[in-house]
């Protein structure tokens, strides 16, 4: 059984809340990829209760990223639930210090697996 910390962002007001899920609800996330949308009710979440404002019951959550147990970020362009060392020039996992800089960095693939700890999501109305 997996346990995930979900960081759910509300793009309308810029507020983010952290929720922890485990058990069968968390198992529904395994195998999902960055960019996929999941109904909040499928994960057993009541968004109106979490955010303290009126959010439609049919709202979906879009996976935007996450990190694995060792802190390596997920990248949407690396396929599969694996960790890989790639040459980066920009994007998640690398912030260049000067123009044109490239560096090899370790990142996690775009698929959620049991070794993912944090999953970032945003509400899609």
From Swiss-Prot:
Name of the protein described by the UniProt record: Small ribosomal subunit protein eS6
Keywords: Ribonucleoprotein, Ribosomal protein
Organism name: Thermococcus kodakarensis (strain ATCC BAA-918 / JCM 12380 / KOD1)
GO BP term, pick one: translation
Family of the protein in this entry: Belongs to the eukaryotic ribosomal protein eS6 family.
Membrane-crossing residue ranges in chain numbering: none
GO molecular function: structural constituent of ribosome
The keyword Glycoprotein belongs to this UniProt entry's keyword annotation: no
GO cellular-component term (any): ribonucleoprotein complex
Positions in coiled-coil regions: none
UniProt entry tagged with the keyword Disulfide bond: no
Pfam families according to UniProt: Ribosomal_S6e
Subunit structure of this chain's protein: Part of the 30S ribosomal subunit.
């Amino acid at each position: 059984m997996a346990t995930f910390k979900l960081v759910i962002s509300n793009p309308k007001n810029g507020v983010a809340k952290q929720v922890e899920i485990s058990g069968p609800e968390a198992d529904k996330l395994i195998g999902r990829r960055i960019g996929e949308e999941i109904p909040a009710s499928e994960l057993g979440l009541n968004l109106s209760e979490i955010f303290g404002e009126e959010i439609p019951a049919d709202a979906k959550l879009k996976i935007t990223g996450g990190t694995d147990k060792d802190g390596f970020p997920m990248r949407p362009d690396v396929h599969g639930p694996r960790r890989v060392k790639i040459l980066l020039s920009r994007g998640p996992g690398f912030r260049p210090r000067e123009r044109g800089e490239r560096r090899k960095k370790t990142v996690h693939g775009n698929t959620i697996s049991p070794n993912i700890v944090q999953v970032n999501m945003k509400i899609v109305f």
